Structures are given as C-alpha cells and as structure tokens.
C-alpha cells in the first residue's frame, strides 16, 4: 500500500513538473502561489523576530530587509539608482508607483531606515500578515471613511515628526496593471505639507516584461530598475498647494518611469539573449 501511494505522489509531482515547464498559465499559478506562500511564511517568522525592533520603534526595517533574501528564488533582479537618498536622517514621505504584490519585493531592495507603511485597513484582517504589519508599526487607513482618514493624516504627521519616521505611501491608492500612473490621491501630500517634511519620490519600472496577472505569466527571470528622485521640499507650502504639488510629483515620476522601464526592457533582453524584435540572438 505504501508503494502505491509513493507511486501516486511521484506521478502527481511529475505532472506538476511537466505542466510547470510547458504551460505558461500553470507556470504562473504555481509561481505566484509560492510567492504568496513565501509572504505567509515570512509573516509568521516576523511575528516573533520583529518584536525587538518593534519595541525600539525601528519601523519595518527588518521586515523588508529579510524579505529580500526570502525572495531570491524568484529570479527577479533589481537595479537601484539613488539608494542613498532614501537613507537620509529625518522624517519624510516616500511615494512610489503601485503595480502588484511584487512591489513588496522591489520595496525590499530599497527600504529606507526608520520607515513605516501606510496600508488600507482591510489588510489588517489578513492572518499573520496583520501581526507582521502591526509589529512593523504600520499605519492603517480607512479610505472609505473620510473622518477616520483625516484623523489618520493628522496622526501620521504628528507621529512622524515625534519619532523621526519616514512613511511609505502609494499615492495611486490602488494597483495599476495597465502601465503609466493613475491620478494620485492627496493623502500623502496632505501629510507632508501638514508636517512640513520633504517628499522622496521612488519609481519602479514596469513589470509586464516578466510578470502580468491579466496575462497569466510570471517568468523565471526579470529585471526591475528602481530610481530614487531628488527630495521635494514642502516647507512654506499650505494645504492650498497640495493639488499642484501632487501633479508636479506625478509628472516627474512619470517621466522617470518611462526611462527606467526602457532600461529594464533592455536589461531583460540582454539577460535572455534577445534582439530588439524579441527573438533569440544567434
């Protein structure tokens, strides 16, 4: 009987191995499932290992620095320009474009010291992830309750100055898988202006050369080019300037996004030995 089940297990594993290598869709589902499983396991780990950092008010430093190594198996390589701009002392609001759950991997490559994340409140109910987020001093915001959202803005501005923290925000407010940027929401800019602290724009290149949820593919290799732009001061600005500030940040980030995406595509092609038309070079 034991031999029978051994044969069944071997047969099923063989089928999965074959499907993984011949079916793009199966390959996608297996890799993305294992990626989410990695997030779950990492969340369980940091529920314990993050406690000392949490007690010292160090933000999410350990969470992201360790997650970078947990995800080495993905084959995704990151190239970072301007890393030192995120490591400066003092509070700041870090804004970044939002594409998919793979953003966590990109964030891990460049995580600023003493930085926390702002997330939508619904994520506070994801098992283990929520505990890891709590120990990372994550700030949850209820986007559908204006009164609570505004209270969170005031709380963030106060805490960041008092504890010398940086805050990572996705100003688009939701994932954008279609390329480019959708209009920015004003929360991050309200916080920066209220606290009179600088904004540090971070731009991730487009992932669609190696990953796409609608396209159902997640290739074994991928290049992400990350660029940190110069900090944008907010001293002297008022809430009346928020709309103009938001548009200006979006414009400079969008220009950088086009440049880093082109570089990432070229790096991917070189890595795979492809010519400009996408064919393998001889």
UniProtKB/Swiss-Prot annotation:
<keyword id="KW-1133">Transmembrane helix</keyword>
<keyword id="KW-0444">Lipid biosynthesis</keyword>
<keyword id="KW-0443">Lipid metabolism</keyword>
<keyword id="KW-0594">Phospholipid biosynthesis</keyword>
<keyword id="KW-0808">Transferase</keyword>
<dbReference type="Pfam" id="PF01553">
    <property type="entry name" value="Acyltransferase"/>
</dbReference>
<protein>
    <recommendedName>
        <fullName>Putative 1-acyl-sn-glycerol-3-phosphate acyltransferase acl-2</fullName>
        <ecNumber>2.3.1.51</ecNumber>
    </recommendedName>
</protein>
<comment type="function">
    <text>Converts lysophosphatidic acid (LPA) into phosphatidic acid by incorporating an acyl moiety at the sn-2 position of the glycerol backbone.</text>
</comment>
<dbReference type="InterPro" id="IPR002123">
    <property type="entry name" value="Plipid/glycerol_acylTrfase"/>
</dbReference>
<dbReference type="GO" id="GO:0016020">
    <property type="term" value="C:membrane"/>
</dbReference>
<dbReference type="GO" id="GO:0003841">
    <property type="term" value="F:1-acylglycerol-3-phosphate O-acyltransferase activity"/>
</dbReference>
<dbReference type="GO" id="GO:0016024">
    <property type="term" value="P:CDP-diacylglycerol biosynthetic process"/>
</dbReference>
<feature type="short sequence motif" description="HXXXXD motif">
    <location>
        <begin position="98"/>
        <end position="103"/>
    </location>
</feature>
<comment type="similarity">
    <text>Belongs to the 1-acyl-sn-glycerol-3-phosphate acyltransferase family.</text>
</comment>
<keyword id="KW-0472">Membrane</keyword>
<dbReference type="GO" id="GO:0005783">
    <property type="term" value="C:endoplasmic reticulum"/>
</dbReference>
<keyword id="KW-1208">Phospholipid metabolism</keyword>
<dbReference type="GO" id="GO:0006654">
    <property type="term" value="P:phosphatidic acid biosynthetic process"/>
</dbReference>
<feature type="transmembrane region" description="Helical">
    <location>
        <begin position="4"/>
        <end position="24"/>
    </location>
</feature>
<feature type="transmembrane region" description="Helical">
    <location>
        <begin position="32"/>
        <end position="52"/>
    </location>
</feature>
<comment type="pathway">
    <text>Phospholipid metabolism; CDP-diacylglycerol biosynthesis; CDP-diacylglycerol from sn-glycerol 3-phosphate: step 2/3.</text>
</comment>
<keyword id="KW-0012">Acyltransferase</keyword>
<feature type="transmembrane region" description="Helical">
    <location>
        <begin position="122"/>
        <end position="142"/>
    </location>
</feature>
<dbReference type="InterPro" id="IPR004552">
    <property type="entry name" value="AGP_acyltrans"/>
</dbReference>
<keyword id="KW-0812">Transmembrane</keyword>
């Amino acid at each position: 009987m034991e031999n029978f089940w051994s044969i069944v297990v071997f047969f099923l594993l063989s089928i999965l191995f074959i499907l993984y290598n011949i079916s793009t869709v199966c390959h996608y589902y297996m890799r993305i499932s294992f990626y989410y499983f990695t997030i779950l396991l990492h969340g369980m780990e940091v529920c314990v290992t993050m406690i000392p950092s949490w007690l010292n008010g160090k933000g999410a430093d350990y969470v992201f620095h360790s997650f970078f190594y947990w995800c080495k198996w993905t084959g995704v390589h990151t190239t970072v320009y301007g890393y030192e701009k995120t490591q400066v002392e003092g509070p700041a609001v870090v804004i970044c474009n939002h594409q998919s759950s793979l953003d966590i991997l990109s964030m891990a490559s460049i995580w600023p010291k003493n930085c926390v994340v702002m997330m939508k409140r619904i994520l506070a109910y994801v098992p283990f992830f929520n505990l890891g987020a709590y120990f990372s001093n994550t700030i949850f915001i209820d986007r559908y309750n204006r009164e609570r959202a505004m209270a969170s803005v005031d709380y963030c501005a106060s805490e960041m100055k008092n504890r010398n923290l940086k805050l990572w925000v996705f100003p688009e407010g939701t994932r954008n898988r279609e390329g480019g940027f959708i209009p920015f929401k004003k929360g991050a800019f309200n916080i920066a202006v209220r606290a009179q602290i600088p904004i540090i724009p971070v731009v991730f290149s487009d992932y669609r050369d190696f990953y796409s949820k609608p396209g159902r593919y997640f290739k074994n290799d991928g290049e992400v080019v990350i660029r940190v732009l110069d900090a944008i001061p907010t001293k002297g600005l008022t809430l009346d300037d928020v709309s103009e500030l938001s548009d200006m940040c979006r414009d400079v980030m969008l220009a950088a996004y086009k440049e880093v995406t082109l570089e990432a595509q070229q790096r991917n092609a070189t890595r795979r030995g492809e010519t400009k038309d996408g064919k393998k070079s001889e």
